[in-house]
Structures are given as structure tokens and as C-alpha cells.
């Protein structure tokens, strides 16, 4: 073989017994750390979040290096790019006041909530519906509800659950939704009025007016590996419970809140109050 390769026997054996360099050893250890975090996130995290987690563990590495290693390993986040607004609808409709006017910032929790409904497909029960309530300060899903029917009760129960979970000062709370009939129904409006909650509305055909809420539903549909594979309503509800309560609120870190989880950020705000 040495003759074929035109190298000396000494060089050949030196190559066989060569020890990995320090840099190669570091890369091997780094690769394992990256794979561990990538697997723990169920392939949801890309380089920025994995880099932040490794930094928090005390590893001094650059984002570019994490990106290079992930490319070398052939792994990337299963989440696609964030939603961007499409063309605006030209349909005329009765407009209601948009109080928050695209300002999704909040100095503390339970001051601005966003809510919306999304469609969930199941193999046996067909379309089901998820209504969620998002806190603008913590990025936490403070309340949610699932139903086989899309009606005012679906929208209302999600908000009732949020109020029960958070026990907010409702007189200082704004809740923002689109203009779909579930949110403009007499039942929904009466409940908000009873608790002195101010209702803010997106302009018809402008989903970007509720962007963080839209982003959550989009993110959920990309990150839940069982999406479009739910057997029935019960199966979907269990999976969504696990995603929201076990993963999203308590384990998923967010760049907008300093790479903390929503629950940890809420706890921090509560302790600081």
C-alpha cells in the first residue's frame, strides 16, 4: 500500500497513530453539545438559540462557529422563516378602534393581551379550532381553549382561562383581536365590558396588526411534530397541551425576552414588582 500511495512506511504509521489535535477534540465535544441541545428542542432550535444556551453553560464560542458546526453536521431548525404580511384586503367593513396601534411592548405582565383562533386538522374529527391568548410582556400563552366548533364560546373560554390563570387587574388590561365574528359577538363584548377590559381591534385584512399572535400559531404549527397527524380531537388536545404548557411556556427560550422562557420571565417580573 505504501508503494501504491508513494509514501514511506514511517509516514504511513505516523498517520495511523496520529492523535486528534486540540482543535479537533474541541470540535468533537462542541458537536456533541450542539446535538444534545438540538435533540432536546426536538429539532426546533437553530444556531442562534443553541449558541445562547451554550454561552449560558459557560462555553466561549462564536455564533459563526456554531453555524459552521451545524452545517458540517447537516442539521438545521425545522422552523421556517417568520410570517411576513401579505397584500392587504380591499374589502370594506365597519372599523373599530385599534388601541395598541402595532405597539406590542408592555412594561409588565397582564397589560396587553393578544388573542386569535387557528384551525387544527385531525384525521377522524376533521377540523378543530384553537383559541390562544398571548401576553405582550412575557410572550407567554396565558390562556387557550380548543373546540370542535368555531364560535363565540371558543374565543370567550380562552380569555376566561387566561383571566383565571393570571388573576390580572382587568381595569388596566387591553385585549387585542381581529374583527372576526367570534370577537365582535355580543357574548364576548359583554364579558370584557363586565371586567372593564378594553378591546382593541385589528383593521380588516391587516393580520400584521396582531403579528406576535400570528407568529405564535405559525411557530406552533412548524414545531409540533405531530401537526397534521393528530388522530382525533383528544389526541390533538393532549399534544397541544404538551406543546404550550410543557414546551413553549416553560422550556422554549425567546430572543425578545433576553433568551429566557416565558414562565421564567414572568416570574422575574413578578419578583421585581
Regions found by a protein language model. Give the residues of each.
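An active-site-proximal beta-strand-loop segment
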Residues: 106-142, 148
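Active-site beta-loop-alpha junctions of metal-dependent nucleic acid enzymes
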Residues: 145-168
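Basic, flexible linker segments flanking DNA-binding modules
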Residues: 2, 9-108, 206, 261-270
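RNase H-like two-metal-ion nuclease catalytic core shared by retroviral integrases
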Residues: 89, 177-179, 185-188, 201-221, ...
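C-terminal domain-tail junction helix/linker
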Residues: 20, 193-197, 219-273
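Generic alpha-helical secondary structure signal
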Residues: 4-11, 29, 154, 158, ...
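Mobile genetic element proteins and their domesticated derivatives, centered on retroelements
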Residues: 1-2, 12, 34, 50, ...
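Short small-residue beta-strand/loop micro-motif enriched in glycine and branched aliphatics
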Residues: 138-144, 199-202, 226-227
Amino acid at each position: 500500500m505504501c508503494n501504491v500511495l508513494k509514501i514511506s512506511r514511517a509516514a504511513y504509521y505516523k498517520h495511523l497513530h496520529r492523535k486528534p489535535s486540540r482543535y479537533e477534540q474541541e470540535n468533537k465535544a462542541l458537536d456533541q453539545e450542539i446535538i444534545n441541545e438540538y435533540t432536546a428542542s426536538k429539532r426546533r432550535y437553530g444556531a442562534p438559540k443553541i449558541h445562547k444556551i451554550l454561552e449560558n453553560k459557560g462555553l466561549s464560542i462564536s455564533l459563526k462557529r456554531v453555524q459552521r458546526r451545524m452545517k458540517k453536521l447537516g442539521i438545521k431548525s425545522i422552523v421556517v422563516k417568520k410570517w411576513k404580511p401579505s397584500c392587504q384586503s380591499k374589502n370594506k367593513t365597519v372599523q373599530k378602534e385599534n388601541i395598541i396601534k402595532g405597539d406590542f411592548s408592555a412594561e409588565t405582565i397582564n397589560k396587553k393581551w393578544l388573542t386569535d383562533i387557528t384551525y387544527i386538522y385531525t384525521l377522524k374529527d376533521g377540523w378543530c379550532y384553537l383559541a390562544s391568548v398571548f401576553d405582550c410582556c412575557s410572550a407567554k400563552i396565558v390562556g387557550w381553549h380548543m373546540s370542535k366548533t368555531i364560535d363565540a364560546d371558543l374565543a370567550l373560554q380562552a380569555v376566561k382561562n387566561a383571566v383565571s390563570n393570571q388573576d390580572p387587574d382587568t381595569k388596566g388590561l387591553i385585549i387585542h383581536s381581529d374583527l372576526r365574528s367570534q370577537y365582535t359577538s355580543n357574548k364576548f363584548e359583554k364579558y370584557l365590558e363586565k371586567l372593564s377590559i378594553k378591546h382593541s381591534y385589528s383593521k380588516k385584512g391587516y393580520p400584521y396588526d396582531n403579528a406576535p399572535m400570528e407568529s405564535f400559531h405559525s411557530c406552533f404549527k412548524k414545531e409540533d411534530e405531530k401537526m397534521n397527524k393528530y388522530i382525533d380531537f383528544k389526541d390533538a388536545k393532549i399534544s397541544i397541551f404538551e406543546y404550550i404548557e410543557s414546551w413553549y411556556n416553560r422550556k422554549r427560550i425567546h430572543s425578545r425576552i433576553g433568551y429566557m422562557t416565558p414562565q421564567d420571565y414572568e416570574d422575574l417580573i413578578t419578583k421585581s414588582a
